[in-house]
Design a protein with these regions (language model features):
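A structural signal for conserved, well-ordered secondary-structure elements
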Residues: 1-777
C-alpha cells in the first residue's frame, strides 16, 4: 500500500516553516516616516533579563521585623510600581511573597544610561517617603497633615519670597489638605508659631508662619546652609507623587550587572546556538540522509517557535524575559529536539533493513516510535514544571499548582532558573509539534515523490548488500563490573569532596560577590590584603578569570555569611586597589548581596525540588511500566540516577566551582534527561515482552532491548553533548563562568546518563529480579 502523503504536503510544510522562521526572527513592521508600526514581534523585540541588558535584582523586607499584612504588601507594591514608572522604568518584574513578607524586584537599566548607580535607584525606590507637616520644629510635634492630603508635587526653580532664585517643591493640596493647612496656618500666625516639614525622619524645612495660607498650596524650600539641587527637588517630587510606603523597607539582598558585560554574553550565546545548530544539522543529515535533513528543517521551526513564545509573537501569549540560562535552555532544546527524529529514523531504518517496503517501513516506524517519544519527553516536562513552580513568580500557574510543596520557602523567584525551565518546557512541547507532526508530514510528502522513493535515502542498504550483522554486547552479563564501577566512582567522588571541600555560593550561604575588571598582572597576596582592609573583612575569597574574546580580565571577590557591601564600600575598595596597584585600573563589573537567611531558604527549597522531581519521575515510571514491574524498574532507574547526580556534583567539586542555582538546574535537568534515555530502553523491554512473551528469559529480554536501544541513546546524547560542548567552548572564550559551570557539569552528567541507562539501571533490575527469584526458590 502506497503512503498517504502528497508532494504538496512537503512543499507546503517547508514553505510554512520558512515563513514562520523568517517572521519569528525578523518580525513584521511597517515604517511611515519616523513612525514604525509593529504587526508581528520578532527576535529584536525580546525582553532580555538583567544578566544580558544589565540592571538590578533586589529583595525588600519590612524593617525591624515588622509583620506586614497582605493589604500592606499590596499597597507597597503599588507605591514601588508608581516610583518605577516615575523613573521611566517600565520593563520591570515585581513580585510579592506573602509568606516571607518580601517584595522581589528586577528591572533592567535604562537604554543609553551611562551612569550606572544601582544603589541610588534602590534607595529611591525603597525609601518610605512619609511626608508630614508638623507644628513646631520637632519630629513629634502635632501633625498638621500628611502626604495623603497632597494632590500633586512639582519641582520648580525661581525666586522665593522675593529672594534670589532657588530650587523648591511646589505642593497642591486636596480639599481636605487645604482646609487642614489653612486652619493650622491661621492659628499659628496668630501665635507666631512655626511649621516643620518632614520626609520620613528628615527635617527638610522649618519656617515661621507669617500669614494664613488658605489657597490650597505650599512650597518646600531648603535651608540656607544646605540648598536643594535640581536632583533633590525632582527626586522629592517623584516620591511625594508616588505616595508613601505603608512601612519602612530594608534591602535583604540585591545584585547588579554592568550592561556591557551582558551584551558580550548575549553575543556569545547567540554564536553558540548557531554553531550548535549547524553541527547537529551536519550530523543528522550524515546519519539519516533525507529524514535527517527534513528533521533539521523541523528543528529550525522549533527554535523559531521557542523564540516566538518568548518575544510575544503570538498576541495571546505575553512576552517573556529571556536570560542567559534561558538561552542555554534553547540551545539544550536544540540538542534534545532531535530525539523524536532520531527515534523515528532509527525505527524506519530497522524496518527497511528487515525487508519491509518503504511505505511499510514508514508506517511501522511512525507507529512504533510514538510511544517512546511521549514517555521519554514527559520526564523532561516534569523537571521543567518543577523548575518553574519552585523558582517562578508566586502568581504563576505552576507556582500555584506546586504551592503545597514549596509554600514553606516562599517564591524565591530565581529568574534565571525560571527562564531556563520555561525555554526547556517550551522546547520539549514544541518537539511534539515539529519533531512528530511536521517531520512526519514532510517525510510522507517526500515519499510520495518518485525521485525521492529510493529506500537508500531513508537509511536502507544498497541493493544486493548484506547488512553487517550487529554484534550483540552482553550488557547484562557484565552487570557485576558495571555496578562495581559505579560504586567505586561514587566513592571516589565522595573522597574528592572530603579532600577538596565543597564550596557553597553566596546564593546559598548569604554574603556578597564583587566582580571587577583589571589590566596587567598583580600580586594576589597584596590585593587580598588591600581588599580585606578596605572592606573590613578577613574572610575574603579571590578568584581571577579572563574573557578571551574581549581580552578583559576579571577578579571575583566573595564575602561569606552575613557580610554585605554597598556601592560606597565598593568605591572605597576600588580607590584603595587603584591607589596600591596603579597599573591595574580596577573597575566594577557587578555586585551581588544575599542575606544568610535567604540563602539558607533557597538551598533548602532547591533540595526539596530535586527530591520532589525524583518522586514524580518514579511515580510516572511505576505507572507506565506496571505490566513489566514498573515500580522495581523505577527504583532501579532512580538508583542509576544517583550515579549521574554524583557525577554532576563531582564535576563541580573538581572544578572548584561553588554550588549555586546553576548546580540545582543542572541536577534537575539530568534527572529528566537521563531518565529519558532509561525510559526508551524500558519501552523496548515492554514492547519485546509483548512480542516474545515467555520465549525469552528476563535477562535475555533486557539484553536484547538494551542492544536495540543503544544506537539511539548514543546518537541522541551525542547531539546534545555537541550543543553543550559548543556552549562550554564559547563560554570559556567569552569568560562566561556562570554558563560554563552549568554546561560542563551538565555535559558530564549526560555522558554518565548514557552509561547508566544502558549499563546500570537495567543491570540493577536484572540483579534484583535474580535475587528475588532465588529467595522464592
Amino acid at each position: 500500500m502506497k503512503t498517504k502523503g502528497k508532494a504538496w504536503q512537503l512543499v507546503l510544510t517547508v514553505l510554512l516553516i520558512a515563513a514562520f522562521v523568517y517572521t519569528a526572527f525578523f518580525g513584521v513592521a511597517v515604517k511611515y516616516g519616523d513612525v514604525t508600526t509593529t504587526y508581528i514581534k520578532g527576535a529584536k523585540d525580546i525582553r532580555f533579563g538583567v544578566d544580558i541588558k544589565g540592571g538590578v535584582n533586589v529583595t525588600f523586607v519590612p524593617s525591624d521585623g515588622y509583620d506586614a499584612t497582605d493589604d500592606q504588601l499590596e499597597a507597597a507594591q503599588l507605591v514601588i510600581e508608581n516610583r518605577l514608572v516615575a523613573l521611566n522604568v517600565t520593563d520591570y518584574e515585581l513580585y510579592v511573597d506573602n509568606n516571607s513578607d518580601s517584595l522581589i524586584l528586577e528591572f533592567p537599566w535604562q537604554s543609553g544610561e551611562t551612569e550606572f548607580d544601582p544603589e541610588a535607584a534602590i534607595e529611591e525606590i525603597g525609601t518610605t517617603a512619609y511626608l508630614t507637616f508638623r507644628e513646631g520644629s520637632s519630629a513629634d510635634g502635632e501633625l498638621v497633615l500628611d502626604g495623603s492630603m497632597v494632590e500633586s508635587a512639582a519641582a520648580q526653580y525661581g525666586p522665593v519670597n522675593g529672594s534670589s532664585s532657588e530650587y523648591y517643591v511646589a505642593l497642591k493640596f486636596t480639599d481636605e489638605g487645604a482646609k487642614a493647612f489653612g486652619d493650622a496656618t491661621t492659628r499659628l500666625y496668630q501665635t507666631g508659631g512655626t511649621i516643620s516639614i518632614w520626609l520620613d525622619d528628615e527635617n527638610v524645612s522649618t519656617a515661621s508662619v507669617n500669614a494664613a495660607i488658605t489657597d490650597g498650596s505650599a512650597i518646600i524650600t531648603s535651608s540656607a546652609s544646605s540648598p536643594f539641587t535640581q536632583e533633590d527637588v525632582v527626586k522629592m517630587a517623584r516620591q511625594i507623587n508616588s505616595g508613601s510606603l505603608p512601612f519602612a523597607l530594608t534591602v535583604d539582598s540585591y545584585s547588579t550587572i554592568r550592561p556591557s558585560l551582558g551584551e558580550n554574553s548575549l553575543s556569545a550565546m547567540v554564536l553558540a546556538g548557531v554553531i550548535a545548530f549547524a553541527l547537529i544539522m551536519v550530523l543528522m543529515t550524515a546519519l539519516y540522509r533525507l529524514p535527517g535533513f527534513l528533521a533539521c528543517i523541523a528543528l529550525a521551526g522549533q527554535v523559531a517557535a521557542t523564540l516566538a513564545f518568548v518575544s510575544g509573537y503570538f498576541p495571546v501569549f505575553e512576552s517573556f524575559t529571556l536570560t542567559l540560562p534561558g538561552i542555554a535552555g534553547i540551545i539544550l532544546a536544540i540538542g534534545m529536539g532531535v530525539d523524536a527524529n532520531v527515534i523515528t529514523a532509527e525505527r524506519i531504518k530497522e524496518e527497511l533493513r528487515s525487508g519491509k517496503s518503504l511505505d511499510g517501513a514508514l508506517k511501522s516506524g511512525f507507529a512504533r516510535g510514538l510511544t517512546p517519544i511521549i514517555d521519554g519527553n514527559v520526564t523532561i516536562v516534569i523537571v521543567a514544571i518543577v523548575l518553574m513552580g519552585a523558582f517562578g513568580p508566586s502568581d504563576g500557574f505552576f507556582a500555584k499548582a506546586l504551592h503545597f510543596v514549596f509554600f514553606a520557602f516562599g517564591p524565591s523567584t530565581a529568574g534565571t532558573i525560571y527562564a531556563f525551565g520555561y525555554t526547556l518546557l517550551t522546547g520539549v512541547l514544541l518537539n511534539f509539534v515539529f519533531g512528530i507532526f511536521a517531520t512526519r508530514t514532510m517525510i510522507r510528502g517526500a515519499a510520495s515523490i518518485k525521485a525521492l522513493r529510493d529506500p537508500r535515502l531513508y537509511g536502507a542498504d544498497a541493493p544486493g548488500k548484506t547488512p553487517a550483522e550487529k554484534k550483540q554486547v552482553n550488557f547484562v552479563g557484565l552487570r557485576k563490573r558495571f555496578l562495581t564501577f559505579s560504586a567505586c566512582l561514587m566513592a571516589a567522588i565522595v573522597l574528592c569532596a572530603v579532600v577538596l571541600g565543597v564550596h557553597l555560593d553566596t546564593e546559598f550561604t548569604g554574603g556578597a560577590m564583587i566582580t571587577l575588571s583589571y589590566e596587567n598582572s598583580f600580586e594576589m597576596s597584596a590585593v587580598q590584603k588591600t581588599a580585606s582592609e578596605a572592606l573590613g573583612s578577613n574572610g575574603l575569597t579571590l578568584q581571577t578569570g579572563e574573557n578571551v574574546a574581549t581580552g578583559e580580565q576579571t577578579l571575583k571577590i566573595s564575602m561569606p555569611g552575613t557580610e554585605t557591601v554597598t556601592t560606597d564600600e565598593v568605591q572605597t575598595l576600588l580607590d584603595s586597589l587603584n591607589e596600591s596597584c596603579p597599573d591595574n585600573s580596577f573597575a566594577q563589573l557587578s555586585l551581588s548581596n544575599v542575606s544568610a537567611a535567604m540563602g539558607t531558604k533557597f538551598l533548602q527549597k532547591s533540595l526539596v525540588a530535586v527530591v520532589f522531581a525524583l518522586v514524580l519521575i518514579l511515580a510516572y515510571i511505576a505507572y507506565r511500566f506496571k505490566k513489566i514491574g514498573g515500580l522495581t524498574g523505577g527504583m532501579m532507574a532512580v538508583l542509576a540516577l544517583l550515579n549521574d547526580l554524583m557525577v554532576v556534583f563531582g564535576t563541580f567539586v573538581l572544578l572548584r566551582a561553588p554550588l549555586d542555582g546553576n548546580f540545582i538546574a543542572a541536577m534537575l535537568t539530568i534527572l529528566g534527561y537521563s531518565i529519558n534515555d532509561t525510559v526508551v530502553v524500558y519501552d523496548r523491554i515492554r514492547e519485546n515482552r509483548g512480542l516474545l512473551g515467555k520465549k525469552a528469559s528476563f535477562e535475555e529480554l533486557v539484553n536484547h532491548s538494551v542492544n536495540q536501544s543503544a544506537r539511539r541513546t548514543i546518537i541522541t546524547t551525542v547531539t546534545t553533548v555537541m550543543a553543550l560542548g559548543v556552549m562550554c567552548i564559547v563560554s570559556k572564550l567569552y569568560g562566561l563562568d556562570s554558563i560554563f559551570t552549568f554546561a560542563f557539569p551538565l555535559m558530564m552528567g549526560m555522558l554518565s546518563g548514557v552509561y547508566t541507562s544502558l549499563c546500570v539501571s537495567t543491570s540493577a533490575w536484572v540483579a534484583w529480579s535474580e535475587r528475588k527469584n532465588a529467595k522464592k526458590n
